[in-house]
Amino acid sequence: MAFPQTPNRLIRPRRTSRGIAISAGGLAVLLGALDTYVVVSIVTDIMRDVGIAVNQIQRVTPIITGYLLGYIAAMPLLGRASDRFGRKLLIQISLAGFALGSVITALATNLDVLVAGRVIQGAASGALLPVTLALAADLWATHKRAAVLGGVGAAQELGAVLGPIYGIFVVWLFHHWQAVFWVNVPLALIAMVLIHISLPPRVRTEEPQRVDVTGGLLLALALGLATIGLYNAEPDGKQVLPEYGPPLIIGAVIAAVAFLVWERFARTRLLDPAGVRFRPFLIALLVSLVTGGALMVTLVNVELFGQGVLGLDQDEAVFLLARFLIALPVGALLGGWIATRVGDRAVTAVGLLIAAGGFYLIAQWPADVLESRHDLGFVSLPTLDTDLAIAGFGLGLVIAPLTSAALRVVPAAQHGIASAAVVVARMIGMLIGIAALSAWGLYRFNQYLKEQLAALPPAPADFPGGQMAGQMMRLRTATVQAYVLQYGEIFAITAGLCVFGAVLGLFIAGRREHAEESADAVDGVSNARDRAPSA
C-alpha cells in the first residue's frame, strides 16, 4: 500500500528548534552565495598579492571556474550522501569544509593554492543549498514548505546582491582581502553550533541506504567538464567557448553517457526510480533549466549592454544589475508565501509570464534607455529600473514553488539528491543559456553591423576633425545600433523561453501529486528519523 508524504508520519523537532535549524541553514546558504560573488570586487587586490599583472586578468579566471567546478560537480553526490547520513551531519561537514577552504584561500600566496582553496569552498558550498532545501522539506509539512523554501532561495539570491558590496566593506574594514575569507570561519562555526543544538541525533536504520559513489563520480566528472568547457570568461569576445572548450564538452558527453549506462545496470543508483513520479519531476528540472538560462543571460548581457550601448565602465555597468538582483529575493520570499496558498503550478506559470513580460520590455530598450520612461498616465516610471525589476521579480517567484513541486514527487528518502538535481539543472541552464545565446548574438551582431554600415552614408571630406574622425563616428553609430538590435533579439528570445517555461510549469506536480512510498520507507528516511528533543 502506498502512502503520501504526510507530516504526521515524520517525527520532527519542536517548532522553535526547527526555526533555529533552518535559520542556521539559511546562514550557511548565504555564506556560500556571498563567496560566489565576492571575488568580483576584490579581484584586483588578489591579483596584486599573487603576482599577476593588471593586464593579465584572464589568469585569475580559474578562481571563478574553480569555485563553479566544485559547486556543481560535488552537488549531486553530496546531496545523495545527506539522504544516507542525515542532513545534520552533511551540513556540518560542508560548513567545516567551507571553513577549511576559506583558510586555504586566505593563506594562499600563489594562484595554484588560491584555486585549490576555492575548489574546496565551492564543493562545500554546493552541498549547503540542496541539503538545506531538503532539510526544509523534512521539517515542514508539504503544504507549508514552499514558504520556507522561498526563504532559503531568498538567502541564495541575496548573496548575489550583497556579495560584491560585502567584499568591499570587509576590505575597507580590515584593509586586506584575506579578511573576506577569514570572516567565514567564525560565521561557519556559529552555523555549525546552531545546527548541532537545534537538530537531534539521527537514529540509525537497520538497513541503511547505500550511496552510488561510482555513479556520483561519473556525474561529477561530466558536470565538471561541462562547467569548465562552457564557461567563457569573455563572452563578448571573438569565440563563444574558450579555446579548450570543445574537447572538454566532448569529454563531458562521454562521461554523461557512461553515467547513464552505469545507472541502467547498477544495483545501487544515484536516484532510485522506485516511487518517483518522473514526468512531473523531469518537467520541474526542465523549467529549472529554463530559469537558469534566463537568469544568466540577464547577468551577462545587461552588463554588456551597459558597456557597449550606454558607454559605462565595468563597475557602472555591473551596478545596473542591482535592480534585477534586488527583485530576485523579494520575489523568492513572496513566491513561497503565495504558493502555500494557491499552489505551485499557478505561481510558477505566473512568475515566468511576469518574467517574460519583463524581458519583452527589455528587448525594446533604445540606445538612450537611461532617459526613457514608461508613461502610465497617473505615474511615470524609469524604463530600465522598471523592466529589470519586473524580470527579476518574476524569476524570483518561481524559485520556491519549483523546488517544492520537485520534492513532492520524490520519496522523502531521496530529497537530498532531488534538491541537488533542481539546483544543478538551474546551473547547467545558466551555462548552456549564455553559451548558446552568445553564439547567436555574436552571429547576429556581425550581420547587424554590416547592415547599419551599409545604411549610413560615408563621412564627408569636410567632416569636423577630418574624414578619419567622421569614419570613426560612423563606425561608432553603427556599432551602437547593432548592439541595440543584437541584445534586443537576445532578450526577445529569452522572453520566449520564459513563456515556454510557463507552459511547462502548468504540468509540474499539483497539490495532490505525491511520490509513492511505503510506510516503512517514510519512517526509514534518514533525515526524518531525527528524534524530537526531550525538553
UniProtKB/Swiss-Prot annotation:
Record carries keyword Transferase: no
Pfam hit, one: MFS_1
Subcellular locations according to the entry: Cell inner membrane
CDD domains: MFS_MMR_MDR_like
Effect of L299D: Still complements for vancomycin resistance in M.smegmatis
GO terms of biological process kind: lipid transport
Domain notes: Has a canonical major facilitator superfamily fold with two N- and C-terminal domains of 6 transmembrane helices (TM1-6 and TM7-12) and two transmembrane helices between the domains (TMA and TMB) that form a hairpin. In the open out conformation (PDB:8PNL) has a large, periplasm-facing cavity constricted on its cytoplasmic side by a salt bridge. Between TM9-TM10 is a periplasmic beta-hairpin that extends along the membrane plane, helices TM11 and TM12 extend 20 Angstroms into the periplasm. Asp-35 is a possible protonation/deprotonation site.
Protein name, per record: Triacylglyceride transporter MHAS_02168/C731_2106
